[in-house]
Amino acid sequence: MIRAANGFRISVRNTAVCLAPNFRQLKGFSIINLGSLQYFRYNSVYSKSIRLVNTLENRIVPVYKECASPQSIGGKSNLKQLQWPKPPKNILILKKRMDERVDHCFETLVQHLQQTYPDICIITETDVAKKFSYLNLYTWTEISDLEQKVDAIITVGGDGTILHAASLFARSGMPPILSFSLGTLGFLLPFDFGSFQTAFADFYNSRSFVLMRMRLRVAMKTKLYNESIYAMNEMHIHRGLSPHMAVLKVFVNDKFLTEAVADGLIISTPTGSTAYSLSSGGPIVHPSINALLLTPICPNSLSFRPVLFPDTFKISIETSNKSRVRPQLSIDGRPLGLTDIGQRIDITSVKDNAIPCIIRSHKEDDWVSDIVSLLRWNHPFHRKGW
């Protein structure tokens, strides 16, 4: 017999006499009436209530409607309005790892959704579902199940959490994504977590606006991959730890452009223009512009500058037989392995599988104010202590 909180005694069979009047405060205990005695039983559903998404209804696909904008020339907006044919039910929530504050916010969010929207089913990663087993969460074993069941995505964390969400749908269309920050700076985080109740209510009731962020399709053939993979930010090919610079041939629409001798090359989306490409000297591109950005990483020739191509173009990169190193290929920061000499990688834009990101309002100038704030433009520089 084990003594528990509030005066309970728990037996080996998880049943004991109720000795405290406030027994209803304990989670996971059901009341059993046996004559004049009240017993409680610990419900195993609270300890092992992890279910699989393949038991849920199929995905609800929203409609994205064109909307007008008095701020734009011609009155046409680059944003779209989200319209659900019926309220979303299967919500995937992804959170930042190894952070107690994020854990608390995650629990608060899940409990609010379950209490306010009882028809909603919360899906999360397996280790998170085990850690918060008392919340009755769903998880998955096959990515294909996730692609077929998830109606919408919520992220709690930073830009990296959004990239992780995009990687889970790297071979399929992506549901709309609602992102919350916890005070950290990020180019992809429109909402502070303190506003999650209002933001989700607007999202749930089709009052949200969406910015469609284009993705890249990276077609390649390696020992591990022989298919196309989507990228939200960029793909880059880099010499890695080798002391030798990579020699890379670049083709545009199958026409030879240049043979670059550099640490590597970056092909990024407008969304990715504020990531690795920006650190390598690339320009900042508005996310509503559909374009491919080619940025060299520490090129041997100073004449090789970043180039912006239309999204209708195809960029191909091939490791030259002059290269003394097998460069490493990475997509959105995830290494995929070494490339072979003569291997070609084709990069194109993806229009039909863009990432629908929920934004704060229908005003398109939010991006301008966000850039000014995040990059601290127009802020004077001061020494600490002055």
UniProtKB/Swiss-Prot annotation:
Keyword NAD among UniProt keywords: yes
Role noted for this protein: Phosphorylates both NADH and NAD(+), with a preference for NADH. Anti-oxidant factor and key source of the cellular reductant NADPH.
Enzyme Commission number, as recorded: 2.7.1.86
GO cellular component: mitochondrial matrix; mitochondrion
Places the protein is found: Mitochondrion
Gene3D superfamilies in the cross-refs: Probable inorganic polyphosphate/atp-NAD kinase, domain 1, Probable inorganic polyphosphate/atp-NAD kinase, domain 2
Catalytic activity: NADH + ATP = ADP + NADPH + H(+)
Family statement: Belongs to the NAD kinase family.
Transit peptide feature, positions: 1-42
Enzyme class: transferase
Protein name per UniProt: NADH kinase pos5, mitochondrial
Upper taxonomic lineage: Eukaryota, Fungi, Dikarya, Ascomycota, Taphrinomycotina
Primary location: mitochondrion
Biological processes, Gene Ontology terms: NAD metabolic process; NADP biosynthetic process
UniProt gene name: pos5
Pfam families per record: NAD_kinase (PF01513), NAD_kinase_C (PF20143)
